[in-house]
Structure formats: C-alpha cells, structure tokens
Design a protein with these regions (language model features):
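Active-site bordering "gate/hinge" segments
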Residues: 1-362
Length: 362
C-alpha cells in the first residue's frame, strides 16, 4: 500500500490572493482527499446589522468583498427596497446593471491575470491587469472610488451618472475590445496555456448539479443556469443575451466561460447605455420597515449566485441580514475537483474556481 501523507495548503500561499486552507491527503503525488478550512477573516458583518441604521449598513454591505463590492451594494439595497415595497426608477435599474457588468469585467480580468501568474506567464498577467486598470478608471471617474463606489442607497442612487459619462464608458470599452479579444485568443489558443488547463480538475454536469455549483464554475460543466436570465435577479428584459455555457468541465472550460463573459458584458453595457431612461434616480427613503417585514433578492455576482435576505423589526435597525455567497456553494465542487489530481495542479484548480474567502466568511 502506498504511503499517505497530509500536506497543508494555505492559508498563506503565493498563488492564493485570499486565506483558504486545505488539508490535502496525498498518495503517490496525487490528491486523495481535500479538507477545506475557513474562518481566518471572519468579521461578523451580518451581526452588525443589529447596531446600525439600515442606511448606514449599506456602507458595511459594500465592504463584504472588494471585487464584488458594487454587487453586494446592489443586493442589499434591492432586498431592503423589496422589504419596504419601494419601486425604484428605471434609470436606477439601468445604472446598477451597468456598474454590475463593469464589475464582472473587472473581476474576470483580475482573475485571468492571477491565472496567468499561477502558471508563470507574467507577460499575460501584465496585459490582463493593464486592461483591468481601464475599468477601475471608469469607476473612479463616474463614482469617485476605484473599488468601493458608494453610489447605491435604499430607494435609488446618491448621484446620477450623466449621459456624457455613459457615452465615455462605451468609448472606453470599444477601445479595450481589440486588446481583450487578443488576450482571450492567447488564453484559449496558445499551447503553453492550453497544456496547463485541458483535462485538469474535471467535473461532470451530473456532479455539478448534485453539488449545486453556481456561476462560471457550474456553467463550465454544462449547467445552463444564470440568475440574470432565470431568477428574480434577472435583467434579460433590459438587454438581449444568453448564458455562456461550456461542456468539458475542466480548467480550460472555466477559462473559456469567463473569457466569453468579458466581451458579453461589454455588449450588455453598450445596449443598456443606448436605451437608458431619464426618469430620475430616486433617493433615500424615510420609511421604516414593519415588524417582521422581509425582503430577499438573488443576483448573479461575477463568481455566481448570491442571495440576500433582510428582516425588519419596526425600527430603523434591521433585525436580520443574511447573505449566501457563491464560494460557499462551490466549496463542495472544489473538493470534488481536487480528488485524484496531481499535487502540482492543485493551485491551478483552486484558481479556476475563483474562490472569494472574504465574501464567504464576512
């Protein structure tokens, strides 16, 4: 019988941007079992809802995660609006969607850079993050912040994004597109990338469904599910698009899905800017939720489905705020994907799942 050993992977590791710890049970240089451990950056953000005015808590909700900050802000505000039975103007919905899709581009370009860095393709890492910088500049010019945008509030937006600024966003994305397409071509067609990604960390569609995998991780295994199309967080009525789905279920397929979603997000933004309404941006509400009033919403974050739940208690403070993030859904898929793989491929597989531990632990 081959000798088995346990190798600790993380929480501090050069290839991981966040503190995920795995105990890897190894036999003959292959992973037999992966046991995840989280809890290193738990901050108790949900508990803080009992001590903060629900409008003040919007700042905290946006800080659940830096990469997905605008998504968490939209999710929290939308859940509170449902609890208070507020219907925001169409322009608010459009601007939130535009910012959310910009966040998706930002997240995927950041991830592509980390993936390139993981297999030693530093030039590709620089190219990915150079393009990402253009999205951060858009955020800064329209909202004042590069990461935390602080534009959403319960009932609408704190300030408008002018039509001239929206047109500038489209111009920037049009200028970026050739470079993005060249970047995607390198990732998907270059042999040095393909050899590291093809056939690694395979998860079948059947397993993906049984493990309730979400986001690009699930769609790369053939799961045709995108909240933007099929759930109460959908905005397919605002723009025409279809979910990006691959079938191989390996690291290459996950890269394929995210690469396609970058250019798809550009198309969505361009369409939204072309038909955005001019019916105002709402504003902060003075309503107080009734005791026991509830609101919930599901949105498609860059990493997958995120669920937001709020409950009022008759005061300005919320009684409960709950978030279920995509990484918590995908951890079971991660441990499954690692079974039987070579130890050298572990960092690659973890990165293609794109875990966000800050979101997961809160």
């Amino acid at each position: 019988m081959a000798h088995r050993s346990v190798i600790p992977f993380g929480p501090q590791h050069p290839v991981l941007p966040e503190p995920l710890h795995l105990d890897l049970v190894i036999e003959d240089d292959r992973v037999i079992e992966a046991i995840p451990q989280i809890g290193f950056v738990h901050r108790g953000l949900e508990k803080l809802t009992e001590k903060r005015d629900m409008h003040q808590f919007g700042y905290i909700a946006e800080r659940i995660c830096g990469i997905c900050a605008v998504g968490h802000s939209c999710g929290y505000a939308s859940a509170c609006e449902r609890m208070l039975d507020i219907e925001v103007p169409g322009r608010v919905q459009y601007i939130r969607t535009i910012l959310h899709e910009l966040s998706r581009i930002h997240s995927h370009l950041l991830w592509l850079g980390l993936l390139a860095d993981a297999f030693g393709f530093e030039a590709l890492f620089y190219r990915s993050w150079t393009l990402r910088e253009q999205i951060l500049k858009i955020f800064e010019s329209t909202c004042g912040g590069r990461v935390i945008l602080s534009i959403n509030e319960i009932g609408g937006l704190k300030h408008d994004i002018e039509d001239s600024e929206l047109a500038g966003i489209v111009q920037t994305l049009d200028a970026m597109r050739p470079d993005c397409e060249a970047l995607v071509h390198t990732f998907l067609d270059d042999n040095s990338c393909g050899e590291r990604l093809h056939g690694v960390g395979v998860i079948s569609k059947k397993d993906a469904l049984e493990l309730s995998m979400v986001g690009p991780f699930g769609r790369a295994s053939g799961v045709d599910y995108d909240v933007r199309m099929f759930d109460d967080g959908a905005y397919a009525d605002l723009a025409a698009f279809e979910p990006i789905v691959a079938t191989d279920g390996d690291c290459y397929a996950r890269c394929q899905v995210r690469c396609a979603e970058v250019t798809q997000a550009m198309d969505i933004i361009k369409e939204l800017v072309g038909k955005i309404p001019h019916d105002g941006i709402g504003g902060r509400t003075k309503l107080t939720p009734a005791d026991g009033a509830r609101g919930e919403v599901v949105i498609e974050q860059p990493r997958g489905e995120a669920y937001y739940y709020v409950r009022g208690n008759g005061t300005k403070n919320l009684d409960r705020f709950r978030v279920r993030t995509p990484t918590s859904q995908n951890l079971a898929g991660l441990t499954h994907a690692l079974q039987g793989v070579l130890l050298a491929n572990v960092p690659m597989i973890i990165l293609t799942i794109d875990p966000c531990i800050s979101c997961t632990e809160r």
